[in-house]
Amino acid sequence: MPEQGLADAFGVTEEARAKINLALHVTGQRPDGYHLLDMLVTFADCGDRLGFLPAQADAFTLSGRFGETLAGDGGANLVIRARDLLREAVGTLAFPVHIHLQKNLPVASGIGGGSADAAAALRGLMRLWGTRLPVAALATLALKLGADVPMCLESRPLIARGIGEEIEAVPDLPAFAMVLANPLKGVSTPEVFRRLKAKNNPPLTLAQTAGWLATIGAARNDLEPPAREAVPEIAAISAMLQAEGALLARMSGSGATCFGIFADMAAARDAAAALHEARPDWYFQATETVSGGM
């Protein structure tokens, strides 16, 4: 059996890349309560890792810096739910499996960790079980797991609209040197939406007259002001990123993770090191996002 804590020791491995909301516009709300969003999304080269191995009986193990946070999650974990839904869809091909989740990203932090894990579970299990679902069926299954899971299946730059199910690739979005920063203080997504003052905001437009950085800067995250009210550390962490030379700093998703875009990876690594020295109790990670051409 592979050593616990090392997802790479398993026969099949998958990356669960951090999902970064470069922009998030809340444009309305459906009668069922779901909010309508316009999002510009990219993915980082850091994230969780999952390993998969045939087993006598289903097993799920955890490791990583934030693994203990999920230890009591049990059957509610999205990875387990993804396994069970996919097994229902493929039937007898789905033999028992040991899944190991190396949890490197903060939990409930606005960078799609659980959704990315679920998407990686679907990809890895289809490889292990030697099966594929039709594109439409896989998209439907992914949406059952959560609004962010379909885009995490893509794990490439995209625009997502609706509740996240309307996906359009953005092939010309470049890679960015970035620092992810999180004060390791939980943010309640329902509370952030409750604090949101306007739910019918202007949609996302991408007029690239002055380059991608200016285009992203002209967009916004409508959830950042209410999240800052709930967690004041978000404002502090954004200011710290800017003080370290970030060309743009913004919150991702419903928080509390913020990202800073830097001129290059050397600047990002230097900033992450300085920030970690200033606040060793917080989370800082230098990373590079994927490009649209991948």
Curated annotation (Swiss-Prot):
Documented EC number(s): 2.7.1.148
Binding residues annotated for ATP, in chain numbering: 106-116
SUPFAM superfamilies on file: GHMP Kinase, C-terminal domain (SSF55060), Ribosomal protein S5 domain 2-like (SSF54211)
InterPro entries in the cross-refs: GHMP_kinase_C_dom, GHMP_kinase_C_sf, GHMP_kinase_N_dom, IspE, Ribosomal_Su5_D2-typ_SF, Ribsml_uS5_D2-typ_fold_subgr
UniProt keyword Nucleotide-binding present: yes
Name this polypeptide is given: 4-diphosphocytidyl-2-C-methyl-D-erythritol kinase
Pathway: Isoprenoid biosynthesis; isopentenyl diphosphate biosynthesis via DXP pathway; isopentenyl diphosphate from 1-deoxy-D-xylulose 5-phosphate: step 3/6
GO molecular-function terms, A-Z: 4-(cytidine 5'-diphospho)-2-C-methyl-D-erythritol kinase activity; ATP binding
Family classification: Belongs to the GHMP kinase family. IspE subfamily.
Described function: Catalyzes the phosphorylation of the position 2 hydroxy group of 4-diphosphocytidyl-2C-methyl-D-erythritol.
Gene this chain is encoded by: ispE
Alphabetical keyword list: ATP-binding, Isoprene biosynthesis, Kinase, Nucleotide-binding, Transferase
Natural source organism: Rhizobium etli (strain ATCC 51251 / DSM 11541 / JCM 21823 / NBRC 15573 / CFN 42)
Any GO BP: terpenoid biosynthetic process
Catalytic activity: 4-CDP-2-C-methyl-D-erythritol + ATP = 4-CDP-2-C-methyl-D-erythritol 2-phosphate + ADP + H(+)
Disulfide bonds listed in the record: none
HAMAP family: IspE (MF_00061)
Active site (UniProt): 19, 148
